[in-house]
Amino acid sequence: MNVSAIVVEYNPMHNGHLYHIKKTKKLTNCDALVCIMSGNFVQRGFPSILDKWTKANIAISNGVDLVIELPTLYSLSSAEFFSFGAVSILDSLNIINSICFGSEIGNINALQDIATTLLEEPLEYKILLKNYLDKGISFAKARNLALVELNRDNKIMSENISKILSLSNNILGIEYLKSLLLLNSSIKPFTITREGADYKDENLHEEYSSASSIRKYLKENKNINILKDFLPLEGFLEFKRLITKGYNFSMEDSMINYIRYKYISGYKNLHNLIDVSEGLDNRIYKSLEKNFTYDSLVGEIKSKRYAYSRIGRILCQYFIGFENYDLNSLLKSTPNYMRVLASNEMGLKVLKKIKKHSSINIYTKLPKNTNTLLSLDIKATNAYSLLNNNIRFNEDYFRSPTIIKNTIY
């Protein structure tokens, strides 16, 4: 059985994601497609607009065979740890033949060259990186500048690196490749050219609109029918059904009052979070005292050194309670379990193969004794239940994976 994998967030799933699924199947000629997906919180530091079970069901209805949850620790981490968490789980299954991700460049060799340099970190690169960091530049920007200068004698390569590293999907793809190299994985990487609007684009476009634009529309409008052209049919019908039921779509603004209440209640322990350094905690506390919306809060805190997404993740981690965990130790280890969210009949065959070839713990129901990583997932869902009244406290203990039969793909 030829099994391919994709790493996704689906916040929410749109036509660009469906394109990714179809192109992956065509490019890899796979018999089955496994998807590892962020759960109730996503990498930019937002709550997912739909709960993880609903997202998983929509994915199965659109051509995925098995959906595995990416632990919250990784889904709310930097691109480096987000990618490592996903790839390490896929690698430990011992049955994944390939992974396919979208990138703006669509050239696997160019991304592979950069990934190799970043992983090996030659001495000149380290020196250049330190020099830029000492100037107060953010790590991501400093890394880009160091790579460009490292290749200054090759003008074409230098210009290409600068362009490649300015685009988010290229950066994430490089991190997937770094993780594969670090793990000495046999999984073969593929990339496809990303189609559609940039993820930051908040305007709806024909055929391929960004998840940001769809969330913005749902936040500001009640006429769901407008989105029919931008969502896969099964996803659109599910949105209509959820609206009829009075489903509570979760947006980032829904966290703000809980975050402010936690702060004024005396929980001033942001310094325990990995991404918080150099007095950033005090900067956040001061902003919490005078900002009442998510955008105004993050907008005031972010700076040349602290990117919007980093601040968003810090706030989301604080909301959930990450500061009470030993995050350094957790991130240095690799996950020893996979949590199944949904499957079809082909996915069940994939699960049987995983059981045969891997020692990883497979959870379709939560065990009585949970490890720290899994307990953080449970805590995240409980925090999410404050934002989405369709999700119960301890929902993780009540839900089993959905098995969907007779999907059309």
From Swiss-Prot:
Domain of life: Bacteria
Residues reported in the UniProt entry to bind ATP: 7-20, 102, 169, 194
EC identifiers of the protein: 6.3.4.-
CC annotations in GO: cytoplasm
Keyword Nucleotide-binding: yes
Molecular function, one GO term: tRNA binding
Enzymatic reactions: cytidine(34) in elongator tRNA(Met) + acetate + ATP = N(4)-acetylcytidine(34) in elongator tRNA(Met) + AMP + diphosphate
Main location (coarse class): cytoplasm
Localization annotation: Cytoplasm
PANTHER family according to UniProt: TRNA(MET) CYTIDINE ACETATE LIGASE
Family: Belongs to the TmcAL family.
Name of protein: tRNA(Met) cytidine acetate ligase
Gene source species: Clostridium botulinum (strain Kyoto / Type A2)
